[in-house]
């Protein structure tokens, strides 16, 4: 796997889970001899929703909700076969979305 790069993008609503998962991935990759760049914190995406409180009148009375999506980006440079096997066997929490791309 010479001259290849693995790009890992993590997304989660809880920043503690995403930092914990990123640290676990970095430790696993470094144990197998790969070079890791990151984790790089990407901008937090905030989605805001306004919902009417009343089903009939009182248009000015609303509830406001927010969802924060935290993101991290990591690059694993020159991964070995052991690195790929270790990352495949890695068990991450259910609240973390992982996107892996080979470049």
From Swiss-Prot:
Gene Ontology MF term list:
structural constituent of ribosome; tRNA binding
Sorted alphabetically, the Gene Ontology BP terms of this entry are: translation
Whether Ribonucleoprotein counts among this entry's keywords is: yes
Lineage runs: Bacteria, Pseudomonadati, Pseudomonadota, Betaproteobacteria, Burkholderiales
- Briefly state the protein's biological role: Involved in the binding of tRNA to the ribosomes.
The Gene Ontology CC terms held by the record are: ribonucleoprotein complex; ribosome
Q: How does it assemble?
A: Part of the 30S ribosomal subunit.
Gene3D superfamilies xrefs: Ribosomal protein S10 domain
What family is this protein classified in?
Belongs to the universal ribosomal protein uS10 family.
Q: What is this protein called?
A: Small ribosomal subunit protein uS10
Organism's domain of life? Bacteria
HAMAP family from the xrefs?
A: Ribosomal_uS10 (MF_00508)
Q: Which residue stretches, if any, does this entry annotate as coiled coil?
A: none
Q: Is Ribosomal protein found in the keyword set?
A: yes
Name the InterPro entries on file: Ribosomal_uS10, Ribosomal_uS10_CS, Ribosomal_uS10_dom, Ribosomal_uS10_dom_sf
User: Which keywords does the record carry?
Assistant: Ribonucleoprotein, Ribosomal protein
Q: Which Pfam families match?
A: Ribosomal_S10
